[in-house]
Amino acid sequence: MLSYFQGFVPIHTIFYSVFHPTEGSKIKYEFPPNNLKNHGINFNTFKNYIIPKPILCHKLITFKYGTYRIVCYPVTINSPIYARNFFSFNFVFVFPYDCETSPYEPAITRLGKMFKVLEEQNQLLSKSERDPVFFDLKVLENSTTTPSTAGPSSTPNPSSNTTPTHPTSEKDTKDMRSSRYSDLIKDLGLPQSAFSIQDLLMRIFQDLNNYSECLIPIDEGNAVDIKIFPLLRPPTTCVSLEDVPLSSVNLKKIIDVNWDPTMMSIVPYIDGLNSIAKISKLSNSDPGLVIECIRHLIYYKCVTLSDIFQFSNIYAPSSLIRNFLTDPLMASDCQSYVTFPEVSKISNLPLNKSLGSGDQDSPSFSVRRKSKSSSIPSNPDSRTTSFSSTSRVSQNSSLNSSFSSIYKDWRQSQTSCSSSNIHVINNRNRFLPTRSCLFDLYRSLSQGQTLKTWYESKYMILKENNIDIRRFITFGLEKRIIYRCYSFPVMINAGSREPKEMTPIITKDLVNNDKLLEKRNHNHLLSATGSRNTAQSGNLKPERPSKVSFEMQRVSSLATGKSTMPKLSDEEEGILEESIRNAETFDKICVLLSKPKLEVESYLNELGEFKVINS
């Protein structure tokens, strides 16, 4: 089955074969005329497969003859009105052997089934032959040849003037058969058919080869309606709420008013960043319907699926990474796809957004926030005084607005990546990263480190080469040169108690986390006053990496010094427990609960001891 559409192969020949009661299997009509003979196709060598035994009838038959592929759907109709109590016919299509005929096969099957019904209803095909030899006229013949005068002896009297009722010449026989055929048509109550099989074959051949569809009327109520569709590989059934659809075409340009309403409502939110769950929420659509729409888009190669981009993800190179070196087109596509636009400011964001108020002298900020230097006092002495709680909140708000502005610009630039496989950007005053650089970056990914750790170690390389890390990861996943290691939470004592006996989750202050946040805040403030080495604050990392998020709630919580965990509802508790029993990934659990990974881990700690399995 095709993985992508390559076009329809033209039909070489189409012919109509029928079983003649006295001559056997024969070709009645073909188009183009004499095309079989001109190309050395001998019908007698395979006629037993065209009009086969009853066991092979009403089945699609495909076989090879020389350099040709023959596809047909033989039909046999049993009825006492026919000369041999049956009528067999077949519409046969001939193609070049080295081609894909699967798009034609459903149409050929439907064509045979349709004419089977038409023949059963009004003898459409048999009457079009204009030959009474196809019908059983024995009864009529016997009734005609019966003497009109009854008597004990059946021997004709030579002296009698009675005219014999049996035909005396070949002409009389032909006239009698024609008369009986007309009587048969009259007895059946059916009009004479003006249907032409030869004309039908010609129009099917020309229309399918030229337009891949045909609409040929047969009578007032029937028509041959065929449209050829490409048969592509069916989409995966493993489409989940946490998957992120990436459009490979501009969906807004191909959208049609006749599309499904759900499909039209979700198209504006397919930007390469939103998960299916978020698309469902933003479009106010049922998640099940959204998944079905995404599967349709996947089938027609308009959308591919990716994971939610998170710095807590773990990626590693696959065995197909060698294709990056052997396929020059892949490398060149990667070079142009993974680079930032020249005006992008996303690289100015710090690695840890919870870091202090923006020390200009800090190494972790100097290369990322040059554009922000004007908003920070240039005199170090002016920052030697301790900050009050109010000034911290004010400075965090300023930092929040800066982050939001940069992230908004970055998100708008990222949505363009889902409209084309190759990112077309402004090439003025910009150099593409080398292929060896990109290969080394892909090769350096490993299962032993999160994406955040990898990004911190490769930050300067990514910045100097103007590489967008999200595009970099997305391209590797699409080309299958890297793969992701998924994380599954597993409760250690999950099998020892029933779900209803699990410890209820209560509202609780995260004392340890608050202390950790207060410690970070204190260190950052000391760093801002110049009394603490900035390298110490830069080395602080959370115990567990969480998914990347540019929300400012974390920074605001630093100012208050406390954070609380809201209690899960009964429905959310059931979702969490069921997800654990079903061995769902952290991504899906976070999406189902609409909570970040750090909070989900805290809820899991309340349920009991658990471990994380990476696979």
From Swiss-Prot:
Primary location recorded for the protein, binned into one broad class:
membrane
Q: Where is this region: Disordered?
A: 143-176, 354-398, 527-551
Its subcellular locations are: Vacuole membrane
Q: Which parts of the chain are coiled coil?
A: none
For the null mutant, the annotation states: TORC1 abnormally activated in presence of rapamycin.
From start to end residue, where is composition biased (Polar residues)?
527-539
Q: What induces this one? A: By urea and proline.
Residue ranges annotated as compositionally biased, kind Low complexity, are 143-167, 373-398
Any further remark recorded for this protein: Present with 319 molecules/cell in log phase SD medium.
Subunit details for this protein? Component of the SEA complex composed of at least IML1/SEA1, RTC1/SEA2, MTC5/SEA3, NPR2, NPR3, SEA4, SEC13 and SEH1. Forms a heterodimer with NPR3.
Q: What is the protein name for this chain? A: Nitrogen permease regulator 2
Q: What's the name of its gene?
A: NPR2
